[in-house]
């Protein structure tokens, strides 16, 4: 098991995770969206009728798989720890911010890497903002930022989320009429449920054992000069790059499928996501994994992300995808990007993150 704590071991786990993502892409998940925590939570909230955007409504088994995979492996390896009490209200609203800003970019950090592997230039632009956000968060960590200590709680607290998502998914299979499903758009594109669930389970196991975190990998490089976590991300990128080249999906373009090329908003939205992820202690994927391994604080964050996903579409905060005119298919050119509501939300979010960061540093110094 020590092997998987080395750079080579983590790279191997990343390659396995990348193969899972490639399989989902091959089996029908949307282009450049084989795996996206933000998009899949958004789709799931839509399927449960929390928003009415008809093209993004599907109960994604991958989300269930990640939570259950992390939960089961943590029990098996005795790494399960039920904790809570670290600024839950602040974490909830940070979860909302992280989700809405990800949907302004049209993807979480995981999807950003998948888009980069397909040659989507707008994702590289987003990466610049994400890295800057992580650097800003790391600066405040150096200054002593903390949301407060988490305390041990009854272990049954950590069982609630895995049980709830398992029951909700069982109802999808047994009584699908309880949910709504997209008939067109990204929500209508998906791998068969048992493959999606299986890959999600494996992904959850790998993410828990490797501590996979897109913000954490950059944070460790900045603060510790430690590149080990980045090896996992590199493995995913390499596999998806090979897959995209092999399937002729790799193209250097201003924006790929379900993306936009509004540079300033790609940068600012991912800046907020990176900053927020460091303050929370993990990116959207990491929050799912921690929620599955007993962290009530991460459960609160995930609930915030779920609410944020519905909020983004109900209040027109999410960005629209850009489109190139195609008269033969009846497609009109569209610039895409966020409307004024989304733009205002991103700016307010960045201001709020600085307030939280300054407060977290000040509180620790006054102890």
Regions found by a protein language model. Name each.
Residues 1-367:
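Membrane-interfacial helix-loop segments of redox and metal-homeostasis proteins
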């Amino acid at each position: 098991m020590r092997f998987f704590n080395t750079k080579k071991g983590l790279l191997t786990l990343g390659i396995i995770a990348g193969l899972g993502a490639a399989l989902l892409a091959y089996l029908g998940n949307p282009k450049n969206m084989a795996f996206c925590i933000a998009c899949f939570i958004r789709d799931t909230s839509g399927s449960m009728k929390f928003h009415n955007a008809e093209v993004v409504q599907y109960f994604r088994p991958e989300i269930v798989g990640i939570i259950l995979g992390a939960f089961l492996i943590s029990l098996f390896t005795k790494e399960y720890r039920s904790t809570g009490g670290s600024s839950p209200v602040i974490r909830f609203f940070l979860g909302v911010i992280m989700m809405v800003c990800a949907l302004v970019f049209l993807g979480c950090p995981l999807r950003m890497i998948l888009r980069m592997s397909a040659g989507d230039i707008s994702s590289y632009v987003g990466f610049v903002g994400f890295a800057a956000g992580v650097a800003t968060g790391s600066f405040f960590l150096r200054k002593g930022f903390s949301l407060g200590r988490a305390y041990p709680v009854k272990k049954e607290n950590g069982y609630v989320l895995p049980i709830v998502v398992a029951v909700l998914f069982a109802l999808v299979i047994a009584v699908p009429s309880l949910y709504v499903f997209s008939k067109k758009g990204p929500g209508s594109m998906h791998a068969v449920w048992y493959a999606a669930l299986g890959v999600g389970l494996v992904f959850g196991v790998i993410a828990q054992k490797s501590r996979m975190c897109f913000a954490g990998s950059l944070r460790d490089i900045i603060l510790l000069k430690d590149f080990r976590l980045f090896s996992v991300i590199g493995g995913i990128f390499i596999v998806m790059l090979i897959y995209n080249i092999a399937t002729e999906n790799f193209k250097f373009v201003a924006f790929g499928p379900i993306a936009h090329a509004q540079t300033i908003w790609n940068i600012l939205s991912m800046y907020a996501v990176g900053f927020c992820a460091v303050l929370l202690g993990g990116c959207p994927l990491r929050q799912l994994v921690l929620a599955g391994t007993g962290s009530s604080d991460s459960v609160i964050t995930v609930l915030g992300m779920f609410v944020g996903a519905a909020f983004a579409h109900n209040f027109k905060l999410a960005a629209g995808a850009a489109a190139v005119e195609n008269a033969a298919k009846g497609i009109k050119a569209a610039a895409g990007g966020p409307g004024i509501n989304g733009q205002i939300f991103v700016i307010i979010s960045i201001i709020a993150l600085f307030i939280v960061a300054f407060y977290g540093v000040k509180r620790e110094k006054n102890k």
